[in-house]
UniProtKB/Swiss-Prot annotation:
The gene is queF. Catalyzes the NADPH-dependent reduction of 7-cyano-7-deazaguanine (preQ0) to 7-aminomethyl-7-deazaguanine (preQ1). This is NADPH-dependent 7-cyano-7-deazaguanine reductase. It comes from Rhizobium etli (strain CIAT 652). Substrate binds at residues 75-77, 94-95. Belongs to the GTP cyclohydrolase I family. QueF type 1 subfamily.
Amino acid sequence: MMPNTDVSSLSMLGQQTETAKSPEEAVLEKVPSNHAGTDYVVRFTAPEFTSLCPMTGQPDFAHIVIDYIPSEWLVESKSLKLFLHSFRNHGAFHEDCSIYIAKRIVELLDPKWLRIGAYWYPRGGIPIDVFWQTGKPPEGVWLPEQGVATYRGRG
């Protein structure tokens, strides 16, 4: 029998929800993991992430991959989607967006392990890729490659 997940504390799932005006205002929610004690990888992929250049206000685009090994909690996916969307009108450098996303999730979940790969499309002709992780993943966990090809342009 599948365990039931208590969703009574969630405020966004199943509700019409406004997008926060900034990442700082955005609410991330969590649900209990029914598999605490089992090491497995959860992956979220945001292939159309957008934010704004803090200098020019022009849009920046990235393909973001977040992998984590839960401890007691899982990030609720609608809240993550809205959190990521809150960057759409937010001006910040690529590195700041990428690391802020990862640290907010770590703060919320206290996962056993987390990594982020943020593959930014070129700005000024140079693609910027940002990688960060909390440490080494636990032994024996299947950790697939993130699968995002290096930017090649028309080459």
